[in-house]
Amino acid sequence: MSNTDTIVAQATPPGRGGVGILRVSGQAAAEVAHAVLGKLPKPRHADYLPFRDTNGTTLDQGIALWFPGPNSFTGEDVLELQGHGGPVILDLLLQRILTLPNVRIARPGEFSERAFLNDKLDLAQAEAIADLIDASSEQAARSALNSLQGVFSTRINQLVEALTHLRIYVEAAIDFPDEEIDFLSDGKIEAQLNGVMADLDAVRTEAHQGSLLREGMKVVIAGRPNAGKSSLLNALAGREAAIVTAIAGTTRDVLREHIHIDGMPLHIIDTAGLRDASDEVERIGIERAWQEIEQADRVLFMVDGTTTQATEPEQIWPEFMARLPKTLPITVVRNKADVTGETLGIADVNTHSLIRLSARTGEGVDTLRDHLKQSMGFTSNTEGGFLARRRHLQALELAAQHLIQGKEQLVSAYAGELLAEELRLAQQSLSEITGEFTSDDLLGRIFSSFCIGK
């Protein structure tokens, strides 16, 4: 498919609605306007007109908006037709437009892709459009809007600019080795490099917060049957999401709930009680439980406080701990504090946290919520923050590693050429975030995840 084609797509969700919008972008957008409207509307003014088919019969009537390029979202000529939101009407109008030469249905995300290719927005801003649409909380929406408005891109561009100045200084020192002053050892380059590294660390911290807002944390509640796992799921969710009975093994399959803690998405997964099961259905549920455990960001190891005084997970259930991935963080949750009389609260026990609560009464559950938020390093103050994706975090991490390696070359050997190369690679990693340096394959993956009309 050619980027010189004119594209059309429905910009509103499929199905019935009060308003349905078709968006057209490309060189033939003016021809579409003349064919469907009989005229070219005044730029950036709403014009109430009939929408006609090939025979001149009115299909619908509504508002037409004309945005001549380059002053449009895509940078191309753009026509928007806002009619009634009936699927039949919109389909008839769409088919009418597709009868015109060099007009085709847009690929997913192609409008945003053209905006990126025409320098109307960078790659991080383009991704922010999809993130704003998908935002699951007010904080996530605000942060996505900040990214769309260029907050994240500005921070990245400032880092790239600082690296450019540093590279110029380093390469000047390489090109003029006979100068009386040894620029590589006078401390100025190292001081500038330390400043860039500190700024990069600050951006990485903000990006981590943005990633948590976008993707959240996957928490699996695991333990023996009747430990109170489903009761805890209900307490965290604030509703009766899971059936709770005194019968061991009530939960036989994975249950999922999505909640927010101060804006951070939390994906809570309740699992079947872990034990040796003879029942085939329960056995399958237990295997699924282990699959979820192995993919979790954190495991809440649920313990019935009436059955043991132990607080060390290895003492409570050594077989469970032996199978658990060694790098997986766990929090031991001693349940039924309302029965045992244990003091509610949180404590650190060797390498893990221990929380005493009552899932039935809800006492101590707020402490668990705060613990989950803090364990991911999430802060609820997102004023001026931005949303970030995993690829952004990876690019920032790679840039940081290149700067660390570059500093080692500078401090240990005053190796200017090697430092310059590490600075270049760090700059390249950062440029991948905004799309200044990005492969076509990556662009394809990013924009294919967008809505058709975006």
From Swiss-Prot:
As one GO molecular function, the record gives: metal ion binding
Which CDD domains would you find in this protein's record?
Answer: trmE, TrmE_N
Q: Name one GO biological process term.
A: tRNA methylation
Quote the record's binding site residues for Mg(2+). Answer: 230, 251
Give the cofactor note text. Answer: Binds 1 potassium ion per subunit.
Question: Which PROSITE patterns does the UniProt entry name for this protein?
Answer: G_TRME
Q: What range(s) does the TrmE-type G domain occupy?
A: 216-377
Q: Where does (6S)-5-formyl-5,6,7,8-tetrahydrofolate bind?
A: 23, 80, 120, 454
Predominant location of this chain? cytoplasm
Is Metal-binding set as a keyword in this record?
yes
Tell me, in a sentence or two, what this protein's role is: Exhibits a very high intrinsic GTPase hydrolysis rate. Involved in the addition of a carboxymethylaminomethyl (cmnm) group at the wobble position (U34) of certain tRNAs, forming tRNA-cmnm(5)s(2)U34.
Oligomeric state and interaction partners are given as: Homodimer. Heterotetramer of two MnmE and two MnmG subunits.
Query: Can you name this protein?
Result: tRNA modification GTPase MnmE
Question: What is the source species?
Answer: Pectobacterium atrosepticum (strain SCRI 1043 / ATCC BAA-672) (Erwinia carotovora subsp. atroseptica)
